[in-house]
Each structure stands twice: as structure tokens, then as C-alpha cells.
């Protein structure tokens, strides 16, 4: 497995505060495979924007803008499946 820190697999994504409060188990499953570097509260959208390292993100060159990802998840019979999709032109 690639080392996400050495290979700079970095991304940003948002999670609604409502999801954190109502479905913490889903958020725990998402956070299990990443290392959060920063979290920023956005009161206007009631979301938290995370900057994180993990193999779920593409490699980013030094001095490049960290890309934004859209998080999609599905819960079925207690199992949580999720994916990160890189947003085009959003940084």
C-alpha cells in the first residue's frame, strides 16, 4: 500500500454538521481511512470542510492547490460504503 503522506495523497471535502450529529457511525467509517490535517467550520452552509491525507485522494504536487472532493456514501444493513469524487475546477 502506498504511503499517503510520502506520496501527498491530499484532499478537501465537506460534511454537513447534521450528518455528524445524527449519523456519527457513518462519519466514523469515513474518517477511519484518512488523517485529518485541518477542519474548518462554515456557519453559512452548516458544514465542516476537512483537509486530509489518505489513499482515497489523488497525489498532489508540492505547491499545488489541494483539490476539493465530493463525498458520496450509502448505508445498507449496518455497512457503510463511500467514495470521494474529485470536483472539477473547485479548489
Description of each model-found segment:
Residues 1-30, 37-91:
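Detector for the mature cores of small, proteolytically processed
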Amino acid at each position: 500500500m502506498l504511503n499517503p503522506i510520502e506520496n501527498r495523497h491530499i484532499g478537501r471535502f465537506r460534511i454537513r454538521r447534521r450528518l455528524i450529529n445524527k449519523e456519527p457511525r457513518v462519519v466514523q467509517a469515513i474518517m477511519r481511512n484518512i488523517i485529518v490535517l485541518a477542519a474548518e467550520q462554515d456557519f453559512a452552509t452548516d458544514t465542516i470542510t476537512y483537509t486530509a491525507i489518505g489513499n482515497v485522494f489523488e497525489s498532489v504536487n508540492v505547491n499545488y492547490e489541494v483539490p476539493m472532493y465530493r463525498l458520496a456514501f450509502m448505508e445498507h444493513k449496518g455497512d457503510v460504503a463511500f467514495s470521494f469524487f474529485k470536483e472539477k475546477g473547485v479548489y
